[in-house]
């Protein structure tokens, strides 16, 4: 096949991140300079985000059997890149005090993982699916354990390595069964084969169903859905804040995109079984995640269980696609994921800012007790954190409310009555632990002898604080005036009249 400039433009995001990876790798080999490599990484992510605008204008988007750069994938590419950019900015301060000479490789691993995320968002082939899954997971083994001097980080890395290996084996075995049943690895070919009823053998239908089921189990591990969630709180607690952010945003978003695309391949006769499966997992994830978050005293563990619940909420949209192929499902999932990504960036950004100012290593910087009375020393930071937490809770006048409103309307319109009510009740439970965090900020302050005095008396503008301010403003603005967001989603997913 003749490769044209149009095809190169379609591949620009992944080519830019790939070239940035090579440049950073060669630069590290020549001379170690953390500021230079941070700047190169941020520039690469920013350029890749800008290049998505060029991809948007192209029409021949499905030019290879391996990948499919279409309207569906563009949103997820943007979210993966924004998450990678935010993680790069937040990591810089932490790497400045990192007690080792291997600081620069952090960005190398982050870039490679982002390539895997883009591949997952654009995959149209089971081989590329597995390649993207491994590319996004393998660098995370090192990134999660980057704080090797911290026992929690080592424990988190080991747990993630073991369970990620298990999930990859499920996905690979599922791919093998689907290939054995259909003889194809391309999503397009598999879809045509199944929809035209060319497979007449009950054995082949059974094998393809089991294969997809095993792949969904693997995706459940990656998405930390109940009952595949056991690694999540420990990994979020042990990993650096910037990597916890990356895990809860980019890693999950890429897997959600490939899950939706894969489920859309299979015809309607497969949907009933998987709807029941996803309904059970969604209910358990929403309820269990919120209940377990109530008794946590570590803010990272609270957000870990919160992410389990939020992933359960997203499954409303996935089920709506499977059950009735609702025309608003993709738009609803997109709006909810945008709100979730922005609020997660803000939450972990503030955690990163607060933890940086502790002078003693024996201080549990992620304890909720640390945030007690924060308003009386850092009122600006506390107000921003309040806005972000309210958005996570889905309180009106925030972007989180718009996302949940769309989800619940979609559930009702898809006639998922009891499921939507159950999810709404689970969401009410979450208000308890979110308000607990907010109230903690405004209580009487504690003795903060072990905190950098600059933190208690000044507000200096730094890149991580700029990100938190931008995110908080976006949450408020789009919560009060969501028309720009809805217009953006209509550009990606034109409404069906």
Swiss-Prot record:
Belongs to the complex I subunit 2 family. GO terms for molecular function: NADH dehydrogenase (ubiquinone) activity; NADH:ubiquinone reductase (non-electrogenic) activity; quinone binding. One of its GO terms (cellular component) is plasma membrane. PANTHER family: NADH DEHYDROGENASE. Pfam families: Proton_antipo_M. NDH-1 is composed of 13 different subunits. Subunits NuoA, H, J, K, L, M, N constitute the membrane sector of the complex. It is a multi-pass membrane protein. It catalyses: a quinone + NADH + 5 H(+)(in) = a quinol + NAD(+) + 4 H(+)(out). It comes from Blochmanniella pennsylvanica (strain BPEN). InterPro entries: NADH-Q_OxRdtase_suN/2, ND/Mrp_TM. Its main location: membrane. Its EC number is 7.1.1.-. NDH-1 shuttles electrons from NADH, via FMN and iron-sulfur (Fe-S) centers, to quinones in the respiratory chain. The immediate electron acceptor for the enzyme in this species is believed to be ubiquinone. Couples the redox reaction to proton translocation (for every two electrons transferred, four hydrogen ions are translocated across the cytoplasmic membrane), and thus conserves the redox energy in a proton gradient. The chain crosses the membrane at residues 8-28, 35-55, 72-92, 105-125, 126-146, 170-190, 210-230, 246-266, 274-294, 302-322, 333-353, 383-403, 426-446, 466-486. GO terms for biological process: ATP synthesis coupled electron transport. It is found in: Cell inner membrane. Keywords: Cell inner membrane, Cell membrane, Membrane, NAD, Quinone, Translocase, Transmembrane, Transmembrane helix, Transport, Ubiquinone. This is NADH-quinone oxidoreductase subunit N. The keyword NAD applies.
